[in-house]
Amino acid sequence: KYNIPTAKFGVFNSIQESLLVLNECKFPIVVKADGLAAGKGVYICETHDHSKKAIEEIFNGKFGEAKQILIEEFLKGEEMSFFIISDGVSYKVFGTAQDHKRALEGDRGKNTGGMGAYSPSRLESEKLEKKIIEKVIEPTLKGLKDINNKFKGFLYAGLMIIDDEPFLIEYNVRMGDPECQTILPRLKTDFLDIVIVLFSKLPMVLLKSLLTISTNLRI
């Protein structure tokens, strides 16, 4: 409806329905649990058998009572986490980060909740930020406004950047972890002041970041 660039996808309500679609898929594909999964409900599936196993695990309760799954086109690019804060009227860019989810060296392991991150993303630039705002953030906020949702808080857009173009992979209405552990140390503005402003009628604070790079590693 709002022409936000994303992967081609389908939503499915049963194992049987999902397995029928696999015969038409070009691999690799992405299989996602529709619901909270601590950042672990995404499978990058290289084969039909791997996809079948992922679908069965989700519907059999690995992430709780999943009622739906998403099967998506696999987008090959570089991930970026892009954050804004909104007080329901205006918004400000809160920063970028790059999260590394796969276990083991060389991305050979399974997806995790996050093995580590750094901020800012190495892809960050004024040109790319402008595209993200115009193609993803502002259409999203317009969509929320159109359904009378005055969104207040943090909006985290999980993006795939392909040839300097942003594609939306997911939203979270929170700060990511471990991403927040790399963004917050870079803030010069008091974090409590930011939170107070979000839920009051005070003018949006001026966000200031240190000109540093912050990293986080999980062991």
Per-segment meaning from a language model:
Residues 41-181:
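Internal nucleotide-binding/catalytic subdomain
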Residues 1-41:
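A conserved helix-loop-beta module that forms one wall/lid of the active-site cleft
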Residues 199-219:
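A glycine-rich beta-turn/hairpin centered on an aromatic-Pro dipeptide
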